[in-house]
Amino acid sequence: MAGVLAPEDVDAFLAAANRENLEATVVAEVTAEPRLRMTWKGVTIVDLSREFLNSNGAEKHTTASVPDDDVKPYEFAGDTVTEKLADMLGNLNICSKQGLSERFDSTIGAATVLMPFGGKYQLTPNQTMVAKLPVLHGTTDTVSGMAYGMHPEILSQSPYEGSYLAVIESVTKLVCAGFDYKQAYLTFQEYFERMGTDPTRWGKPFAALLGALDAQLDLNIAAIGGKDSMSGTFEKMDVPPTLCSFAIAPGKASEVISPEFKEAGHSIRLVSCDPHDTAALTANYDAVLSAIRAGKVVSAWALGLGGVAEGLFKMGIGNQIGTRIDDDYDGNLFAQQIGAMLLECTEDIDLGVKVGDTVPEWVLEYEGERIDLTAMQEIYEGKLDKVFSYRGHTGETTEKFSYSAETYPVPAVKTVKPLAFIPVFPGTNCEYDTARAVERAGGAAEILVINNLTPEAITQSIAEASRMIARSQMIVLPGGFSGGDEPDGSAKFITAFFRNPAMKDAVHDLLQRRDGLMLGICNGFQALIKLGLVPYGEIIDTSDQCPTLTFNEIGRHQSMLVRTRIASNKSPWLSRCKVDDIHTVAISHGEGRFVGPEALIRQLAANGQIATQYVDADGQATMDIQYNPNGSAWAIEGITSPDGRVIGKMGHTERVGKGLYRNVPGETDMKMFESAVRYLQNQ
């Protein structure tokens, strides 16, 4: 990042950067003389006039040729609906990308309103990214929605038509999520082959931009930013003409809907028109939005390459709800209809045409044929599984542990407003979410950015951290990827920091003399277990006989919501929970697989130190990767110290809030922070 500062602000800026553990250097000065000069080792290597820079160089001209084009509809192979459905679901532009998506943290910031995949089974792909605006204090219902549109098979035939429809598709997806298209703006990502001097090559971006411009004028929506590249050529290979439209709009979390079917017995309707008939299209947008706001439409899907058939399958897969198509529906199930919307309605409203009804079985019933969609799901999920795997162990249950506490320890000193110390190491990214969770529970939070730019800075950070722990009642190690999880594993810098004698003494004083609490989430849990604070309650030299957290069994990062069961409420952190309570919790980690000797695990279970376990939809502890994302032994998600005051867990319990994760069912708030605050208040 580069910044231009007034001379009197430079020292303050450098000091602020240092407090955030950032390197900042003065690299240039603005002068009155209108020339750009650069020197290297005392030698001037650049000396250009401002007037020359403002000219942008010499004028250039080229010729663009746009041939007549004719877009042919995409045809899926097969003579029967079953054959076409199988071909469609195996198409690279339609098949599941879940294994790719789960490599990216989708819940950071505790503001995600719609998860990338929704429904009970988290399998319906969400078409619109929706998140609350970030606020450090308080709550908000204000969200932003973002959706994209792009079809390379159309762009390759007609850059103009492909770009026009990209805009239409991106806006239609916003409407299907409950956003008003009249408040939307656009941004474009463009990528074309190297132009050279060929007029037909220049004609492709020319036609694409005309198509996008016409769509903007028709919808009265402006593009306010974008990025382009014309370097998509390698030797004799060229990228297809590419213009991806992103539509963005503000809205309210309470008015957002998600695309997964909600219940059997609802009617399914199709609203469509010629996408170039702007009056009809915008009338459809207004009518659908009105029905969504009235609660008559509970899920909606913007049709794409796979048409109605793709929409029915993807809307149904999240909750395994099938479709019975009406006998009198005569539409083409596989026709691409950009701008069309498939609606799940709670009542038979006068909007578009009726396609059919939702049914409780995971099937598609059409013209007397009953298609088992489980086999189709295998095609859909399996296409890219060898490239972006997200499937592993299935169906294996494991032992459930249970330990119910009847009484809880009392802190040595009652505190009216308990203070949590939250250290931020290089790579930590959850400190704001964690501090907000503490404050929402009635406590106070104090954040310290650990500075490791110099040896002296590390010494100062240790001294300051020790002082802050001395006045705190809790230590919370937030999640992230400290040190980039290098070298060869997570939390090494955190553990080295806490093994410093001053830090070790401060932690032991908090836990052993003042009866304080300590929590480690994700990266923080990794630090706690490598320090020995869990399961032993103190910082020790660990050995290969100690439990640890290692790389996920699937061999990559996992991000999703999981179900965890309270196995023991012995910890003050879990005093407001009951054994067998189940919560839906966000996870995001690459090293979360708990392993340890069986004898030790049995000992921990007997002492009530196994706090939480991953469970399936039936509440059974499981090794199934759909529910146990890292392959943890005995499905263990969290453990505690012997007295329960220290707890470590992989799930991001701090990532909760009103209106979040609306497309995945389940109770998300474990009230861990409320439990800790009440314990320290002796309530």
Residue ranges: model-predicted function:
Residues 460, 465-467, 506-509, 541-683:
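Amide-donor transfer/coupling interface in amidating biosynthetic enzymes
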Residues 1-484, 497-508, 639-640, 668, ...:
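Glycine/proline-enriched, intrinsically flexible loops and inter-domain linkers
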Residues 34-35, 231-233, 254, 526-530, ...:
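Short, well-ordered, mixed-charge alpha-helical segments that flank or form enzyme active sites
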Residues 302, 522, 652:
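Active-site glycine-centered loops adjacent to acidic/histidine catalytic or metal-binding residues
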Residues 229, 482, 524-526, 591, ...:
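Catalytic metal-binding/acid-base residues of hydrolase active sites
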Residues 13, 432, 486-488, 528-531, ...:
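Short glycine-/acidic-enriched loop or helix-start segments at secondary-structure transitions
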